[in-house]
A protein has these predicted regions:
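Acidic/histidine-rich alpha-helical segments that form the ligand environment
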Residues: 77-120, 135-146
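A structural signal for long alpha-helical coiled-coils and helix-turn connectors
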Residues: 24-28, 109-113, 156
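Short, contiguous alpha-helical
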Residues: 10-14, 21, 29-79, 123-174
């Protein structure tokens, strides 16, 4: 049963990541530094994908594309959440980071054990901090990626009247 679960989870989670990648790759280079809304959504999607894949959660999160935490309401316009990128990273940097995080996800799912399925991803001690079983944080993460991939596709349609096609499933299997 675990094998079927891991295979199904990866093919769909990988497809969500591939959808995000396709949207980022399609965004015209000419708009990369001028239309920061697209960049900030793409960055947020990637940084949170990596963050939620940091299992077990230890509170430490070194990112390949560094950020600074900001106080609520102090973020630059368009930034989602409190992780503000230290600069506008290039499309190439973003795609490389996404490829590395995709592999991190694939390997994690491939090596997932029954024992790990019982563990919890706990963000912190506060009442409203996230506290999920490992399978649930993986589903949550996949939904989060797909949500923002859809937002990027909408921005693509608005800006260039084009968007990537549907990704049915990821190619590689765990």
């Amino acid at each position: 049963m675990l094998g079927i679960f891991k295979h199904s989870l990866w093919t769909q989670f990988g497809a969500s990541i591939d959808s995000l990648r396709n949207a980022i790759a399609m965004w015209p280079e000419a708009y990369w530094n001028t239309d920061t809304k697209f960049f900030y959504i793409a960055y947020h999607s990637q940084i949170m994908l990596d963050y939620y894949l940091t299992i077990p959660h230890t509170g430490e999160f070194p990112s390949t594309l560094p950020f600074t935490f900001s106080e609520p309401g102090a973020q630059p316009e368009g930034v989602l959440g409190d992780m503000v990128p230290d600069r506008i990273y290039t499309k190439s940097e973003m795609l490389s980071y996404l490829d590395a995080t995709r592999e991190k996800c694939r390997v994690f799912i491939q090596n997932l054990t029954d024992e790990q399925m019982e563990e919890r991803w706990i963000e912190g001690p506060e009442e409203f901090d996230m506290n999920y079983a490992v399978p649930e944080i993986l589903f949550y993460n996949m939904r989060h990626v797909q949500h923002h991939a859809a937002q990027l596709n909408m921005l693509l349609r608005q800006k260039i009247d084009k968007a990537p096609g549907w990704v049915f499933r990821a190619d590689e299997t765990p």
